[in-house]
Swiss-Prot record:
It comes from Ovis aries (Sheep). Gene3D superfamilies: 1.20.1250.10. It is found in: Secreted. Belongs to the leptin family. The keyword Disulfide bond applies. The gene is LEP. Its main location: secreted. This is Leptin. Keywords: Disulfide bond, Obesity, Secreted.
């Protein structure tokens, strides 16, 4: 598969995920910059992203979305898996070794946070994910390093 096609597919999938997040109406009700106590483990924005940082960020969001009971996020979680596969292809084309992403210790406390503020967790996670994806889209145009 030509790497240009992989890069185009990656960008298209990112745009699709952003659209899916927009379609979940309640995600518009919280600013991604809003501080919600206990949700510091949800990644914020990283202006300069390498392929490995993108993969790591997506892995964290996958773990968070997998722990949410909302059916809204199932397709988005599947899309993130596919997006990570595309990033792995891009990384392989540049001979970048992507480290295995391990479960985050900070997510072990996720259950407690979810019980306290399920709705807020979903809204903040999706809002920040959307911002991160838009950052990744911009970064892919700059041909990110490993």
């Amino acid at each position: 598969v030509p790497i240009r096609k992989v890069q185009d597919d990656t960008k298209t999938l990112i745009k699709t995920i952003v659209t899916r997040i927009n379609d979940i109406s309640h995600t518009q009700s919280v600013s991604s910059k809003q501080r919600v106590t206990g949700l510091d483990f949800i990644p914020g924005l990283h202006p300069l992203l390498s392929l490995s940082k993108m993969d790591q960020t997506l892995a964290i969001y996958q773990q968070i979305l997998a722990s949410l009971p909302s059916r809204n996020v199932i397709q988005i979680s599947n899309d993130l898996e596919n997006l990570r596969d595309l990033l792995h292809l891009l990384a392989a084309s540049k001979s970048c070794p992507l480290p295995q992403v391990r479960a985050l210790e900070s997510l072990e406390s996720l259950g407690v946070v979810l019980e306290a503020s399920l709705y807020s967790t979903e809204v903040v996670a999706l809002s920040r994910l959307q911002g991160s994806l838009q950052d990744m889209l911009r970064q892919l145009d700059l041909s990110p390093g490993c």
